[in-house]
Curated annotation (Swiss-Prot):
Belongs to the PEP-utilizing enzyme family. Residues 343-399 are annotated as: Linker 1. This is Pyruvate, phosphate dikinase. It comes from Entamoeba histolytica (strain ATCC 30459 / HM-1:IMSS / ABRM). It catalyses: pyruvate + phosphate + ATP = phosphoenolpyruvate + AMP + diphosphate + H(+).
Length: 885
């Protein structure tokens, strides 16, 4: 097995082996772009390194040395040479892009001797020692785990001492002194000599990159974005000959996107810094210039035109938006990296539509490029169209959308405070180790850095609004204060940012809901509907929720939870009285009070849906859930007796008695659903009557209806037979007689008990449709209580890889999924036209939707805000696993 590949020998399509960065360098070499010489160490070596207890695989360094000698031969330079030294960068790169998650070391090979040679060769002492101090700080931080504050404070102190603001204002002697102080401080921190042998440095660096794969921020990023080992397993290491953007004003470094990664607009987008190294742009240490200004830059003749040509070549080859890094060394341009651009959902959607219209890709390819979970970003709120207040300050619009939150100055504080409120992370510049703060923040605001800085790239990838480079803000992290002009912003103060314009506003701004069905996203959703075979319904309990569902593209209501209608403030007291009733007559009296209220809700739903399916699930939870808890009542009664208060005491004791009567050892598999409807048929009778009368009244108004009655917790076909004969048919006859019309409806069941799935052939003799309740079906199949397991052991099981994921979030295909497949197969043996859907929370989760498509379900039902996600996921499922209907 080949373990190291020269750029000209590597297969650029094999990102799994060479990593995205290595594969990109190989591809750029292949298509004739100017790439420095170098080689890639494969991801397999990273996996072996970790499996060996973080030890270098045997013989690997010998192979690295052979490849380094080839680079020496091609370049005419010598690694560690004291006359013409070869210096390299050591870069990480996994199969999937993880901006800022992994580590890069520049200028490797420098020591006290090679730096003198570099100064002589370039006739630029300042450049040589600037490169040296950068190398020491990067190497110390990444390879030796030195706290970067050690270097940052030393550099800041030197600038203060010299009375300057920018690194570029320090002279050669300053850089010399900084390099030696950095080495001394590194040795003090590590209690060991700084490595001077270039091959020792290289081995340290390769090990550091391999180790970073299992570093906290890389693991957190993979967990947040659900990046599995199948998608990316280990990081490759690219060893690249150094080229320098910090050799003077005829040198530069930059980052570009072939299209705008924030909006998707087909315009060249990027930034560059003169007399700088690549990490300066990405780290956001200085705020760069926009790339178009290079066209007028007399120090860099022809470079902008060359970049435009490279932009065209990259998109022509990859048919994807590319994010690339370049360096210009003394007017000569080199490409250091290209990868598929990390864009927010807005840009991904627009570029997809535009590329289809440009003939670069197909509709199917455009849809497959959208990560379904990223669709949530398109539902972000925005600033009001005509907002008149002047902003406090303006930065760069780095990631679109608007966000309001309480200001925090530290990622750890963001995590802590986000547990109770919305937070906005405000930093001078962000670093990769701030990633945990990004996850919880509503938005990110930085004082330094451009649109291609770490903060901007990661925020766009997460779909978080971001304003970067707001230089009018001065932050004092120690005091947790920011100054914007004369205004002091303290931790906890509210700010609003607009990532689409770069504006920052004082206080909370009322934000507007997005428009889902129009524009580029509307086009993508239209294409998704043309492709997908599985319907997308909504879980909705009120007419207002149904209206919102239609706006998002729902094709029906797959679950109306009637118990939620009982929980309204004016209804709950009636429900409680019904439960406390001692006689059937008394119970019916209160049910009769509830009936017209439920009927009005049903009328609203049916009218809103206007002929689309409305599936009403009859009462599901046990009755005790509508009453106060035993502990609550006992405490209240104890306190009343203790204080001598007697008013209302008798009523409390009546409720306590009923709560004790209704108490169950295991209520989740107890007296609920059809069992309750069988022992207390008057409850289901009221609900059926309300729904059928609502259907009749809507029909009489000339509005189409598609009414479906769904029974929960069925385990035995006789439960359905009993309910049909003794309740459903008599009520249906009475309603048709009362209104003098036919009132059509469908009668079906939830399949949420394992026995129902295993006897689906019998149950299908009664039920004309099934709907999987996968929350309870998962509980039953695993014998896990959801409430207990999610808090106690499932996270540990996922961490230890006992389970691949939380089965209550992502459908368990081998177990729960197989039970579903059995039910579908058996049910359709009895009733070939059987309609089958899913209405558990899995109905909006992309992987689960794919499984539902694969086993032949007719529809999925999910919350309104998951409908666009489900539509995209359903189309992707059809593209991956085509079926006829």
């Amino acid at each position: 097995m080949q373990r190291v590949y020269a750029f000209e020998d590597g297969d650029g399509t094999n990102k799994k082996l060479l990593g995205g960065k290595g594969a990109g360098l190989c591809t750029m070499t292949k298509i004739g772009l100017p790439v420095p010489q170098g080689f890639v160490i494969t991801t397999e070596m990273c996996k072996q390194f970790i499996a060996n207890g973080n030890k270098m695989p045997e013989g690997l360094m010998e192979e690295v040395k052979k490849n380094m000698q080839l680079v020496e031969k091609k370049s005419g330079k010598v690694f560690g040479g004291e006359e013409n030294p070869l210096l390299v960068s050591v870069r990480s790169g996994a199969a999937m892009s993880m901006p800022g998650m992994m580590d890069t070391i520049l200028n490797l090979g420098l020591n006290d001797k090679t730096v003198v040679a570099l100064a002589k060769l370039t006739n630029n002492e300042r450049f040589a020692y600037d490169s040296y101090r950068r190398f020491v700080s990067l190497f110390g931080k990444i390879a030796l785990n030195v706290d970067d504050e050690v270097y940052d404070k030393t550099l800041e102190n030197k600038k203060v001492e010299k009375g300057v603001k920018l690194d570029t204002e320090l002279d050669a002697n300053d850089m010399k002194e900084l390099a030696q102080v950095f080495i001394k401080k590194t040795e003090e921190f590590t209690k060991q000599p700084f490595p001077v042998d270039p091959y020792a440095q290289l081995e340290f660096a390769i090990c550091a990159v391999f180790r970073s794969w299992m570093g906290k921020r890389a693991v957190d990023y993979r967990r947040e974005f659900k990046i599995t080992p199948e998608q990316a397993d280990g990081t490759a290491v690219s060893v690249v000959s150094m080229v320098y953007g910090n050799m003077g004003n005829d040198s530069a470094t930059g980052v570009c996107f072939t299209r705008d990664p924030g909006t998707g607009e087909n315009m060249f987008f990027g930034e560059y810094l003169k007399n700088a190294q690549g990490e300066d742009v990405v780290a956001g240490i200085r705020t760069p210039q926009i790339i178009s200004k290079m066209a007028e830059d007399a120090d860099l003749p022809g470079c902008y035109e060359q970049l435009l040509d490279i932009r065209k070549k990259l998109e022509g080859y990859f048919h994807e938006v590319q994010d690339f890094e370049f360096t210009i060394e003394r007017k000569k341009l080199y490409m250091l990296q290209t990868r598929n651009g990390k864009m927010n959902a807005t840009a991904t959607v627009r570029t997809g539509v535009d590329m289809v219209e440009e003939g670069l890709i197909t509709k199917e390819q455009a849809i497959m490029r959208i990560a379904p979970q990223s669709v949530d970003q398109l539902l972000h709120k925005n600033m009001p169209a005509n907002y008149a207040e002047a902003p406090l300050v303006k930065g760069l619009p780095a990631s679109p959308g608007a966000a309001t939150g309480a200001v925090v100055f530290d990622a750890d504080d963001a995590v802590e405070q986000a547990k109770g409120k919305k937070v906005l992370l405000l930093r001078e510049e962000t670093k990769p180790e701030d990633i945990h703060g990004f996850f919880v923040a509503e938005g990110i605001l930085t004082c330094r850095g451009g649109k291609t800085s770490h903060a901007a790239v990661v925020a766009r990838g997460m779909g978080k609004p971001c304003v970067s480079g707001a230089e009018g803000i001065k932050v004092d992290v120690a005091k947790k204060i920011a100054k914007i002009g004369s205004l002091e912003v303290h931790e906890g103060d509210i700010l609003t940012i607009d990532g689409s314009t770069g504006c920052v506003y004082k206080g909370e701004v009322p934000l507007e809901e997005p428009q889902v069905g129009s524009g580029y996203f509307g086009t993508i959703l239209k294409w998704a509907n043309e492709i997908k075979k599985i319907g997308v319904f909504a879980n909705a309990d009120l007419p207002s929720a149904a209206k919102k569902a239609l706006e998002f593209g729902a094709e029906g209501i797959g679950l109306c939870r009637t118990e939620r209608m009982f929980n309204a403030v004016e209804r709950l007291p009636i429900v409680v009285k019904m439960i406390l009733s001692n006689t059937l007559e008394e119970r019916k009296k209160y049910l009769n009070e509830l009936m017209p209220l439920q009927k009005q809700d049903f009328i609203g739903l049916l009218k809103t849906m206007n002929g689309l399916p409305v599936t009403v699930r009859l009462l599901d939870p046990p009755l005790h859930e509508f009453l106060p808890t035993l502990e609550e009542l006992m405490r209240e009664i104890f306190e009343m007796k203790l204080s001598g208060k007697t008013e209302g005491l008798a009523e409390k004791e009546v409720v306590l008695k009923k709560v004790k009567e209704l108490m169950e050892v295991n209520p989740m598999i107890g007296h609920r659903g059809i069992r309750l409807g069988t022992t207390n048929p008057e409850i289901y009778e009221m609900q059926i009557r309300a729904f059928l009368e609502a259907t009749a009244e809507v029909i009489k108004e000339g509005i189409k209806t598609h009414a479906e009655i769904m029974i929960p917790n069925v385990t035995e076909v006789n439960e359905l037979i009993n309910l049909r004969k003794n309740v459903l048919e008599p009520v249906h006859e009475e309603v048709e007689k009362k209104y003098g019309i036919k009132v059509p409806f469908m009668y079906g069941t939830m399949v949420e008990c394992v026995r129902a799935a295993l006897t689906a052939d019998k149950i299908a003799t009664e039920a004309s449709f099934f709907s999987f309740g996968t929350n309870d079906l998962t509980q039953g199949t695993f014998s896990y209580s959801r409430e207990d397991s999610e808090n106690k052991f499932i996270p540990k099981y996922v961490e230890l890889k006992i389970l691949p994921a939380n089965p209550f979030e992502i459908l368990d295909r081998p177990g729960v999924g197989e039970v579903m497949r059995i039910a579908v197969t058996k049910g359709r043996q009895t009733r070939p036209e059987l309609l089958v859907g899913i209405c558990g929370e899995h109905g909006g989760e992309p992987s689960s939707i794919e499984w539902c498509h694969m086993i032949g379900l007719n529809y999925v039902s999910c919350s309104s805000y998951r409908i666009p996600v489900a539509r995209i996921a359903a189309a992707q499922a059809q593209i991956r696993h085509p079926r006829e209907n």
